[in-house]
């Protein structure tokens, strides 16, 4: 069985523990983080779990951080062939055209956005200029989706992006609306042909999984990916939980590897 964990966060060692604990506190997680987001730790847990690849990223909380983070992610991916690098942008960042070209030239094809921590809405007008450029360059967007406490990243914020840029492939993480898994809110987004999702911080987060299975059925079955949300959750434990889900074997195989391998057409995985 081959596995891609396409939702992992990494941080430089000097800030990893602080960043992870702050995230855990913000989301009021039901249990302490399993890990702290260092590269060495992720490499070890991937080997232990038998996971073949991990997409790695970190969101810039200011325009100043964009280039530093993108170069950090690239440097780690160049050292670890099982890492798939994913970049970041920020609404205040002005040099986005040049930075997107730099990313593409260095084999980075995705952009991670986390509106809650970046302090702008997913559909901020400034971001539309960046999404347009990403679409032109055959790049993809992966966004944290949902927070019942603040309305900056729910399905209604990704819907206009996916509709305006039909060739921009958009990954709506956490089944499309973390913490507010209302199928009627998610369905209009999930049915769009350029929208994908992952199961990170969803099935593991709630006890009543019935609504989540209903949401899962809204998506094209080939548009669903496995992600652990490391370091908040342990990839090995999340993989085991995924194997125990009430999902047909062939569909589960797609979620664990084939779907993202097909999605990530830039190189053979």
Model-assigned labels for residue ranges:
Residues 7, 46, 73, 103, ...:
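Conserved, mostly hydrophobic/aromatic
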Residues 10-14, 61-64, 91-95, 118, ...:
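Active-site environment of divalent metal-dependent phosphoester hydrolases
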Residues 41-45, 69-76, 99-103, 126-130, ...:
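A general structural detector for well-ordered alpha-helical segments in enzyme core domains, enriched
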Residues 109-110, 123-225:
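Catalytic pocket-lining loop regions of alpha/beta-barrel enzymes
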């Amino acid at each position: 069985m081959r596995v891609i964990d396409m939702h992992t966060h990494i941080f430089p060692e000097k800030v990893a523990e602080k960043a992870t604990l702050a995230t855990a506190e913000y989301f009021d997680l039901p249990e302490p983080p399993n890990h702290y987001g260092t590269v060495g730790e992720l490499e070890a847990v991937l080997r232990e779990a038998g996971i073949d690849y991990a997409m790695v990223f970190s969101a810039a909380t200011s325009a100043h951080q964009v280039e530093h983070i993108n170069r950090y992610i690239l440097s780690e991916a160049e050292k670890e062939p099982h890492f798939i690098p994913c970049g970041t942008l920020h609404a205040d960042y002005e040099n986005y055209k040049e930075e997107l070209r730099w990313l593409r030239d260095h084999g980075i094809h995705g952009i991670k956005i986390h509106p809650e921590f970046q302090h702008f809405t997913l559909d901020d007008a400034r971001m539309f200029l960046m999404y347009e450029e990403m679409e032109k360059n055959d790049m993809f967007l992966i966004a944290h989706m949902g927070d019942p406490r603040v309305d900056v990243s729910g399905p209604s914020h990704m819907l206009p992006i996916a509709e305006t840029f039909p060739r921009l492939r958009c990954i709506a993480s956490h089944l499309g609306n973390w913490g507010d898994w209302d199928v009627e809110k998610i369905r209009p987004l999930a049915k769009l042909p350029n929208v994908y999702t992952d199961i990170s911080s969803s099935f593991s987060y709630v006890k009543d999984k019935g609504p989540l299975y209903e949401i899962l059925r809204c998506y094209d079955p080939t548009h669903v990916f496995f992600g652990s949300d490391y370091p908040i959750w342990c990839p090995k434990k999340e993989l085991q939980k995924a194997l125990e889900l009430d999902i047909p074997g062939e569909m589960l195989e797609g979620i664990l590897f084939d779907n993202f391998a097909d999605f990530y057409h830039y190189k053979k995985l």
